[in-house]
């Protein structure tokens, strides 16, 4: 009886917490987001220009004519909007099956970094199976009338001219990344769209669902209700993909950089395992400063988000985790996991997809960013990894005034430098002793999540 009473109290607390988060964050979701004029907008390696060529438009974005048509802008605006909405949005959920050995039926208040990690991996899987150019056919249908920033008047503020700092190293062109499967047919691409979302479902058997990540976290001393930093989440995602049994997932793996170093030989070993070539998601936990983010690193962050290989950044600001997907000028564009939504049963045929897609982007100043974050990249094969390493090295060299970059590429294996990169794990232990020491250091520096 006593245990049952305790469970009832915990469930009541969960419901109250969910209601509080919805009250706190729902208004943020509905708040208008404005974009500045005369600047490009970058979204996961793509650059969008919304040029307004009518000479009657004044320098402040106004117009001397009241008869201008929206057609001048609507096409490009729709491209950006459709691209953003098509990214998978994973948020707090409530009333899902109880997490094993706990009374939790919601992750409100503690699961935001797990959610941002899920979103980054989901983007990697979208690129892997469907290609970077894929967009959801119904993306524009869920656009809310409350998001007035997409009106023609505001769109004029998006009139961009490529910044000089990017003109030498970046071209505003669509990514040529090809999908693993031929998804010319709508039915085929939508099947994979639903399948990818189902892998992140909130029930125990989902490969990358909250239940599985919490289960893996137990092996490193984490339990449901604890906060998880970006570095820890990186290793949980790696372990989750290692343990996945779906045949479709055997062609992709995850590499987590050790001490801000990517050992190329270890990446090649993962990609060319057992005679088959795999795609790799590379996760690099870094710090962009000490107590606060060093503003000198902003050019680095912009350079990273402008690369076609980038699948986003697990980061945030103190006490809140966000999934960063782009930028404009000095503001980062992100997806917010803090809005609490109801559990969706993905076992139902044609389950609703709307709640897995965010209708509106949000922006925040780079100076508010917490220094602790994890950067993600996707490389389909060894050749792409070589190209990514080359492009990343350019960004690292050009964006820092320090004598050393935020992370480096080193030829050879980690073990050649007395580090363990691909350890053999015991069933009851997620991390090796060396990794535990490094993660303990990371954990003491990472932000505390509400």
UniProtKB/Swiss-Prot annotation:
Reactions catalysed: [protein]-C-terminal L-amino acid-glycyl-phosphatidylethanolamide + H2O = [protein]-C-terminal L-amino acid-glycine + a 1,2-diacyl-sn-glycero-3-phosphoethanolamine
Subcellular localization(s) per the UniProt record: Cytoplasm
Enzyme class: hydrolase
InterPro entries: Papain-like_cys_pep_sf (IPR038765), Peptidase_C54 (IPR005078), Peptidase_C54_cat (IPR046792)
Any single Gene Ontology cellular-component annotation: cytoplasm
E.C. no: 3.4.22.-
GO molecular function, one term: protein-phosphatidylethanolamide deconjugating activity
Keyword Hydrolase: yes
Keyword Nucleotide-binding: no
Family: Belongs to the peptidase C54 family.
Name of the protein in question: Cysteine protease ATG4C
Gene source species: Xenopus tropicalis
């Amino acid at each position: 009886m006593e245990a049952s009473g305790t469970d009832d109290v915990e469930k009541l607390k969960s419901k109250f917490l969910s209601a509080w988060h919805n009250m706190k964050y729902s208004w943020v979701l509905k708040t208008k987001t404005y974009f500045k004029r005369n600047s490009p907008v970058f979204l996961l390696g793509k650059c969008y220009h919304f040029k307004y060529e009518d000479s009657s438009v004044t320098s402040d974005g106004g117009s001397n004519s009241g008869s201008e048509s929206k057609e001048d802008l609507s096409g490009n605006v729709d491209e950006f909007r459709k691209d953003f909405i098509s990214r998978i949005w994973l948020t707090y959920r409530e009333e899902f099956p109880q997490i094993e050995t706990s009374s939790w039926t919601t992750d409100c208040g503690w699961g935001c970094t797990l959610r941002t990690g899920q979103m980054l991996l989901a983007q990697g899987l979208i690129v892997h199976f469907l290609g970077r150019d894929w967009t959801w056919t119904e993306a524009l249908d869920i656009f809310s009338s409350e998001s007035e920033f997409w009106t023609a008047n505001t769109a004029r503020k998006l009139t961009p001219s490529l910044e000089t700092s990017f003109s030498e190293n970046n071209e505003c062109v669509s990514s040529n990344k090809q999908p693993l499967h031929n998804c010319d047919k709508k039915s085929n691409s939508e099947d994979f769209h639903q399948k990818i979302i189902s892998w992140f479902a909130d029930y125990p058997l989902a490969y990358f669902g909250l239940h599985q990540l919490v289960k893996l976290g137990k092996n490193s001393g984490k339990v449901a209700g604890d906060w998880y930093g970006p570095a820890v989440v990186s290793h949980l995602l790696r372990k989750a993909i290692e343990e996945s049994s779906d045949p479709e997932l055997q062609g992709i793996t995850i590499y987590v950089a050790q001490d801000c170093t990517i050992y190329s030989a270890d990446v090649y070993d993962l990609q060319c395992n057992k005679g088959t070539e795999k795609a790799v998601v590379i996760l690099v936990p870094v710090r962009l400063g000490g107590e606060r983010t060093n503003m000198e690193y902003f050019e680095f962050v912009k350079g990273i988000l402008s690369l076609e290989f980038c699948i986003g950044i697990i980061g945030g600001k103190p006490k809140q985790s966000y999934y960063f997907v782009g930028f404009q000028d000095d503001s980062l564009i992100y997806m917010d996991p803090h809005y609490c939504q109801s559990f969706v049963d993905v076992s139902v045929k044609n389950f609703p997809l709307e709640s897995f897609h965010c209708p509106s982007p949000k922006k925040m100043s780079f100076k508010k960013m917490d220094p602790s974050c994890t950067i993600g990249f996707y490389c389909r094969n060894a050749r792409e990894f070589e190209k990514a390493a080359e492009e990343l090295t350019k960004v690292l060299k050009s964006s820092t005034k320090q004598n050393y970059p935020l992370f480096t590429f080193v030829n050879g294996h980690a073990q050649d430098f007395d580090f363990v990169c691909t350890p053999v794990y015991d069933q009851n232990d997620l991390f090796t002793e060396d990794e535990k020491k490094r993660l303990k250091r990371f954990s003491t520096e990472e932000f505390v999540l509400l």
